[in-house]
Amino acid sequence: MKKFILLLFVAQLSFAQNYWQQHVEYEMDINMDVSDFTFDGEQKLVYTNNSPDTITKVYYHLFFNAFQPGSQMDIRSRTIKDPDRRVGSRIFGLEEKDYGKLNISSLKQDGKNIIFEERETVLFVRLAKPLMPGEKTTLEMIFKGQVPLQIRRSGKLNKEGIDLTMTQWFPKLAEYDHEGWHPNPYIGREFHGVWGNYTVNITIDKSYVVGGTGYLQNIDEIGHGYGEKTKKTNGDLLTW
């Protein structure tokens, strides 16, 4: 009995020493146009390779692109035997102004342009310089999005009268773990992402109130009872 316990302890210790997970630091500046619910974004991502592997490519999720007629999610929802009743054929019937869109304009690695390809809900990126174990690299991106009519979780103009419900709305780096990359096309299932920190600036019409996770950095400027003092902002826009 004593030998068995000792061996089990050694096995657990060995596993703990070999455990690793990747890490990301996001910085994003978002400008939302509430006249048509489109947004422009700039993203800076610092990716730390804590794995024992050399990384030569990365993938991003572009979830909003699933909300277009003919997408894998649309086809699946219309052809499986037990479809999600919230979806069904609703994506197929969307007008273009109500599509979900997420498109990349440019992408750089450590200041150098790199090759990328949009494959519906997945962005494939070939790194200009391999990312070695223990190293970091900075990926800078310019992108544009369009918020879809709310069908499932995320979208605009829901039945509760909320203009924007934003989930999985930005280009999100896919997970890399001991099994490799997980660039799964989005078909309405669960999400899997990299552990990290986010700094996000959202500029929107100042008549809107933004609710979300995280810590508000400019409480006195925002007002709405967040801070002790309220400083009125000139103009029509406000950055949260």
Report each predicted region and the residues it spans.
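Short Pro-Gly-centered flexible turn/kink motifs
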Residues: 132-141
